[in-house]
Amino acid sequence: MTILTQTCTPFEGQKPGTSGLRKKTRVYMQPGYVECFVQSTFNAIGGIAGKTLVIGGDGRYFNAEAIQTILRMASANGAALALVGQGGLLSTPAASNLIRQRGADGGLILSASHNPGGADEDFGLKYNISNGGPAPEAITDAIFEQTKSISSYKTLDTPDIDLGQIGTVALGDMAVEIVDPVEDYAALMEELFDFDALRELFASGFSMKFDAMHAVTGPYATTILENTLGAPAGTVMNGVPSVDFGKGHPDPNPIWAKPLVDLVMSDDGPDFAAASDGDGDRNMILGKGIYVTPSDSLAMLAANAHLAPGYERGIAGVARSMPTSGACDRVAEALAVECFETPTGWKFFGNLLDAGRVTLCGEESAGTGSDHVREKDGLWAVLLWLNILAVRKMSVKDMLQDHWQTYGRNYYSRHDYEAVDTAAANRLMADLTAKLDDLAGQTFGACTVASAD
């Protein structure tokens, strides 16, 4: 096999955001686009000679082709081992877990999260570091600098390899280990939660629906909920991953998951319902007749996490992004543990998790997670909710009412404005920012602004 050094010209705008480089799929499909960004990433981290990488994605359109490109480049750049999910599939939290369990040096995750998939939709690629979390700004800034001057990349002149069979194959001097994408993650969940109690919950007649939204969590949810815990067949809806997410929008909110919401709000709806997004890191929680906001969900989980075996000693602390409501702050105060507010972006929780300062983290954008991995984790949140329900033997609605009686209620609303003009949006944000210093103390209707930042 011949290592090729190909010349290339930098592409403008390859600046990673809070979750990697997100672009339209056709942008990524340009000749050399993936190669320039991946080589820039390898260069920015000091090369990958002798290293182990985890590679996988959410199965969206162009994932398969991009993974083959990355594997050839990893081999040409001297990597010793690539761990790849069977079929190229790995949920983002499962990839984080695999990096940590196998002691990998990092990973490349191919996903645009909750954004739609397809040739004319969205694509993404991000680098995670050895703790399993998203690359911090120092690394993403270094990657961006490399993209400005990249002039060549290394690859192999080889055909694609078969990622459909579990096992190890050689690609040049690099070993490619194709792993079951669900197995290690499911084992971790069984360590954290009382699976016997969950089996009893389902055996009692407790009803549930989980909408995988034709995305990557389908196989994970089917294996854990139906095959392991005994939930009835059909509990998992839209459970087969598709390159265009069934021509849907894999964002677990009341708009894009409306069929699930309508079902749980109906007279004969299930006791509990949940959904996850494209790459499996977000979640939506519902009970019969009620929707749980992500901010309230984080607070509820913080107050009740000790009921699950993995958290029976209590939580060290809790962290939330700045736009997330202060509901979890009230719980932290009552538990006498630390509470942190961070900028938006899961990577800002990493130092707190690594230092053992916090156990749970959450965002109002439907991301919740804990120190078990370094990414938010949709199915983990669902299983923790189930564990709490199994122990407390209350409905979701009754649990929320009890929580609000105990800690008070933070009224909170998120509004999404999609496909708006960028210039107009920037003007709006600039105007709001300019007014921040003067907003505190102002009254709007019946409400007075306490603080603004």
What are these regions (language model features)?
Residues 2-11, 121-268:
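Gly/Ser/Thr-enriched, mixed-charge loops and adjacent short helices
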Residues 19, 55, 95, 108, ...:
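Buried hydrophobic positions in well-ordered alpha/beta secondary-structure cores of metabolic enzymes
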Residues 270-272, 285-287, 312-453:
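Phosphate-binding and adjacent anionic-ligand microenvironments
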Residues 43, 54, 58-121, 223-285:
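N-terminal small/polar loop signature for handling phosphorylated ligands or for N-terminal nucleophile
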Residues 87, 137-182, 287-364, 368-369:
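Proline/glycine-rich low-complexity loops and linkers
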Residues 26, 64-69, 94-99, 118-128, ...:
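Short acidic, glycine/serine/threonine-rich loops at helix termini
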Residues 11-27, 113, 212-216, 220, ...:
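Conserved phosphate/anionic-ligand binding catalytic regions in large, soluble enzymes, centered on
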Residues 1-76, 171-208, 228:
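An N-terminal, well-structured beta->alpha segment
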